[in-house]
UniProtKB/Swiss-Prot annotation:
GO terms for molecular function: ABC-type transporter activity; ATP binding; ATP hydrolysis activity; ATPase-coupled transmembrane transporter activity. ATP binds at Y445, G469, S470, S471, G472, S473, G474, K475, S476, T477, I478, L479, K480. It comes from the Eukaryota. Belongs to the ABC transporter superfamily. ABCB family. Heavy Metal importer (TC 3.A.1.210) subfamily. GO terms for cellular component: mitochondrial inner membrane; mitochondrion. Residues 436-672 form the ABC transporter domain. The chain crosses the membrane at residues 111-132, 156-179, 229-252, 254-274, 341-359, 375-396. This is Iron-sulfur clusters transporter ATM1, mitochondrial.
Amino acid sequence: MLLLPRCPVIGRIVRSKFRSGLIRNHSPVIFTVSKLSTQRPLLFNSAVNLWNQAQKDITHKKSVEQFSSAPKVKTQVKKTSKAPTLSELKILKDLFRYIWPKGNNKVRIRVLIALGLLISAKILNVQVPFFFKQTIDSMNIAWDDPTVALPAAIGLTILCYGVARFGSVLFGELRNAVFAKVAQNAIRTVSLQTFQHLMKLDLGWHLSRQTGGLTRAMDRGTKGISQVLTAMVFHIIPISFEISVVCGILTYQFGASFAAITFSTMLLYSIFTIKTTAWRTHFRRDANKADNKAASVALDSLINFEAVKYFNNEKYLADKYNGSLMNYRDSQIKVSQSLAFLNSGQNLIFTTALTAMMYMGCTGVIGGNLTVGDLVLINQLVFQLSVPLNFLGSVYRDLKQSLIDMETLFKLRKNEVKIKNAERPLMLPENVPYDITFENVTFGYHPDRKILKNASFTIPAGWKTAIVGSSGSGKSTILKLVFRFYDPESGRILINGRDIKEYDIDALRKVIGVVPQDTPLFNDTIWENVKFGRIDATDEEVITVVEKAQLAPLIKKLPQGFDTIVGERGLMISGGEKQRLAIARVLLKNARIMFFDEATSALDTHTEQALLRTIRDNFTSGSRTSVYIAHRLRTIADADKIIVLDNGRVREEGKHLELLAMPGSLYRELWTIQEDLDHLENELKDQQEL
């Protein structure tokens, strides 16, 4: 429904657009006549909506007609194959490179010292039951026998018992202390390399991932490295060594029967543990997926807090978050239940073996083949074996879980870096303006939807060039391609006559400055956000660019000045202040190519004009190549060159007056609509004054 007011200007504009077929399929809009002064924002915004709809209809008319007349093609949905998993041995092999790094003798010496302390601790630990046996046997004699050993000898045996036990603990703790630096360095190196690899991946990869799940996976992966190293160095290797020594002692001291029971127990215990843990693994994977999903929902909701409040969707997101938590709860219940089954089975196997060995030992004592000290030795050795056996089960479970967590982390490192340097990259010439040329460039974010279609144009060096067109015509895509966030599917992009793929990526991006529509800010101080433009800038340079960007008045009003925290994504400051901060940041970078990606589209007219004056004062023509991506044509009317995009192709090129004089010009149609809206706004101002 569209109610026309008595205002002749409004009626004339709207009726003319209906007659020309420029406005259709519009959303219901209501213009009110009474209380015009209080309804001006509603009226003007409604008019802007009409213009946006008209603009879309003009620029997409041909493509819609072509689509409606084109034969329909059936699309086939490809089944996604299951992502290959990294083998556990491959993960351990990759991790070993950080424990035994090439050329780092200091780390290797630490590993060897830790290994020596480990062996010493276990040898002393095995000696403890022997000293205990000797003490028991020396007490089980007739004290009136003149051949009885002196009490001092017994005391020495007890002293050796204590020294062996304390020495075992001491060497074990020293091993932990020596190896701690090796483990932490490995964790730091893997985490840093993973972070650096992720920063090399293309923008498309990052946009297709949920940040919450990604950060949670990295956090679990780094913790998994610590757990794997702890399991391997502090448990698996010591346990294996101790079990081998104990089995050898039992075989040598008490015969093949004890050895057979020990071997059978170890074999059955290991098989049961491995099989059951493998069965439990998919429960842990399901729990991790649910945990990632819950973290992503929570993070997205908190980041988009304002949007949640705008649409009153707290309950919807709470239900969504609760659903993820319910899935995580169900998976964790299965993990706990399967853990109880595993623990019960392990204890049953060990208790059965211990009972059998104690029965055989008691039979030997009754038959006179073994002493009471031997029985105590068997009991101590078996119980001493039970400790590493119990650890073996729990450690193996933790090891499997950690390997699952590490699998995701290491798979992140396997993602291919698509945007790479040439074998011998070139450096860009310094202190000269750059021209940019697109030669038959075709690109799309999805294979079935091309954004740029065989686009060719030139942005002359030192000129102020504007790129205009409807939403989705490819304006911002041009920036992403020049910056090499993506590479074109076909065609070439040249800077000063050379393909940008020949240039060093860091050098290329160093000469390009960007003032985006939505300024990305860190949850840090104003000072740090400005200095992010060039980390090595001096304090004087930062203050200078802040003054040039007219950000100084704001900073003087703030109680904490430069130390004011801007909040998450800069939510604590206004849109105009964010844009001024972005300009200050780019001024500090001092780039030779400047992109303004609809930098003022979200601002009011007063703030927009102030920012445009700031931009004109600091980015004069001739000194830099500047590219303005804009919807509001008045902001770029003074451009040296205007490129009009339509459905991914270059529709028109020229200066403002040339394009207005061109018959059937799309630019002229868009300009006329905007001028009518501006005239409408002026009429409304006049009526308000009356």
